[in-house]
A protein has these predicted regions:
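Metal-cofactor-dependent catalytic cores
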Residues: 1-147
Length: 147
C-alpha cells in the first residue's frame, strides 16, 4: 500500500531540512512554514515528493547511507511510482494533489550532497513536483490514493 514514509520542510532556502510528522498545506500556496510558501505560488513549487526506493537505489549504487532528508524533497513515499502521476490527480490522506512534472535532480542538490555524478544517477528518479488542489494536513503514514 502506497504511504508517506517521511515529511521534511525548510523554513528558508538553503536551510537544513527539518523532519516533521505532519504538515499543513494550502491550495495554490504550498506548505505552511516551508521556504516556498506564498500567495499564488507556481504550481510546481508547492510540494515535492520522492520515492524512498529511489533514495535506497542511489545509496546502493553509491555505496553510501545518505539520509532521506538530505534529498530536499518534502514528502518521501513508499510503494508508489511517482513518475506515473504526471498530469494525474491523487490524494495523500485528505489532501488532493496534481502531479505537474518530474522533479529532476539539479546541480544545487549535487553540490550539497558532494556527489559529482548525482544528477546522472538520479535521472528519472528525482521525484515529482505537485500542485496542491485542496487544503488540509499530510501526516507520516498517510495513504496515497490515485483517483
Amino acid at each position: 500500500m502506497a504511504k508517506v514514509k517521511k515529511i521534511c520542510i525548510a523554513k528558508n532556502s538553503g536551510d537544513k531540512m527539518e523532519d516533521v510528522n505532519q504538515i499543513e498545506v494550502i491550495a495554490n500556496k504550498g506548505i505552511v512554514n516551508d521556504r516556498y510558501f506564498k500567495d499564488n505560488n507556481e504550481s510546481d513549487l508547492q510540494i515535492t515528493l520522492i520515492e524512498s526506493e529511489n533514495i535506497d537505489y542511489y545509496n546502493r549504487i553509491s555505496n553510501s547511507q545518505m539520509p532521506y532528508i538530505n534529498f530536499r524533497r518534502n514528502v518521501i513515499t513508499r510503494e508508489i511510482e511517482l513518475n506515473n502521476l504526471v498530469s494525474k490527480h491523487f490524494f495523500i490522506g485528505e489532501v488532493k494533489l496534481l502531479g505537474i512534472r518530474l522533479c529532476d535532480p539539479c546541480k544545487y542538490l549535487q553540490d550539497m550532497l558532494k556527489d559529482k555524478s548525482l544528477v546522472k544517477k538520479l535521472i528519472n528518479r528525482g521525484g515529482l513536483r505537485c500542485e496542491i488542489i485542496s487544503d488540509g494536513k499530510i501526516s507520516t503514514n498517510d495513504i496515497i490514493k490515485i483517483i
